[in-house]
Amino acid sequence: MCLDDNHLRLEQAISTEWLNLNEAAGPVLLLKGLAPCFASGANGSILLYGQFYDGWRKILDGTGHQVLPLRSKTKGWGDLEFWQQQSASESIRRLYRFDGYEYLAAGCEMVQLADRATGKPLPKPISSRCPK
């Protein structure tokens, strides 16, 4: 419905990127939803699909604005840093690790990047644990 209403084709509403998270398994497909159909504000749908012996499988399903591969690995797969914007001054940073089947959240921090009152960038981001 949204695609038709906005006169968009699917390829105009998503972005794709290949990531190399496990050299033995081959590339992983990163799909990011774009506004107006699959994102609102800075955050959109983010999906990762990996190819395994039994075919393609979704290995991460979330909402955010950035996924960064890290150098650290779990079970042979690169760990991921996943960012989700909360406000103009704050974001959530999640660490994801591969459990052998899919990526699961392994850590979470609230990161304040700018002064809440003025919007000016902080000299150094302030991190705290996410509330439970």
Language model region names:
Residues 1-8, 54-66, 107-109:
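Blade-edge motifs of beta-propeller repeat domains
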Residues 3-5, 70-132:
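Acidic, small-residue rich beta-repeat scaffolds with periodic aromatic anchors
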Residues 39-44, 87-91:
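Short, solvent-exposed loop/turn segments at conserved positions within beta-propeller repeat blades
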